[in-house]
C-alpha cells in the first residue's frame, strides 16, 4: 500500500465516516476499552497481522484493558488513505467488543 498525503480537509471528511477516531499531532488516533486484558491483546495481534499484510504499521500502546492506536505514514510524514483503510479494518474487528 502507498498513497499520497491527505489535506486536513480530506482528513476531516474521512473522519466523519469512521467512529471513534480523532486527528491530532499529524496522526489519526483511537483509544479502545476492553473487558479483559487478553481481549486487548487479541485485537493487537489481529492488527499486527493485517499491518504486515498491507505494510502499514500503526503505533500501538497497550495498557490494562485499553489500547491506543495511532496511524500515520512514517515514510510520508502524515495521514494517507492507507491510514483510513487500516482504521476502517480496526473498527470492523472491534465492533463486537464491549468498550
For the regions a protein language model found, what residue spans apply to each?
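Charge-rich alpha-helical segments
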Residues: 1-99
